[in-house]
Amino acid sequence: GDVFSAQFCIMASGCLSSANMPKFDGLDDFAGRKFHTGRWPHEPVDFTGRRVGVIGTGSSGVQAIQEIAGQAEHLTVFQRTPSYVVEAFNRPLGDDEQRNIKAHYQELRAAAKKTFGGFNTVMNDQSALSVSEREFRQRMEEAWNSGGIGFLAAFNDFGFHEEANKRGQEFVRDKIRHAVDDPVTVEMLLPYHILGCKRLCLGTNYY
């Protein structure tokens, strides 16, 4: 390979460069197939007709659950703590969209450098506590329907004011209550921790 000389070497491989393999009794005795989202096989995995268990409802778990549920005969989810899941609105990009994005790479990167976290999301300059209930819900609906991590930018104090955050939490919990029919399942899916204190999960029809 190539050899480089530099005054400083910054290793930016990140904390996710190696999979965190769980250790618990009985794992090695399991007779079925085991998969880890951090070491997913390159070839397709078919869960058709299978009984599947997924451990965990973090970002990777949420994305796996929604895909496996459409194939497996039966899916059991082992959850410790429910997550706030916002729609990702993943979809194939059309040729025109791709060409337009590629033609404006420089502008998009320049704009991202001026935003919080490097994402092309504009933070609302209003407090969640400064608006009426109608205005709050209107802004939150807009953010919800846009999807993605920009949801947290709906108001500027979700990350700084407890009461503002509670207002955002309850909005998401209401969305879950309306999406899930079974009251027992609803209660298991409702998160009560601070909105945004953990990585916001993005899903596609998760609820």
Regions found by a protein language model. Give the residues of each.
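Conserved beta-strand scaffold positions in the cores of enzyme catalytic domains, especially
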Residues: G32-F35
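N-terminal Rossmann-fold NAD(P) dinucleotide-binding loop
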Residues: G61
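A short, basic/flexible loop-to-alpha-helix module at the beginning of a structural domain
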Residues: T37-G49
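N-terminal FAD-binding dinucleotide-binding subdomain shared by FAD-dependent oxidases/monooxygenases
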Residues: G1-D28, E43-P44, T57, A72-Y207
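Aromatic pocket-lining residues of Rossmann-like dinucleotide-binding sites
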Residues: A64-I68
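Short coil/turn connectors at secondary-structure junctions
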Residues: G49-R50, E73
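Beta1/beta-strand and adjacent pyrophosphate-binding region of the FAD-binding site
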Residues: R50-G58
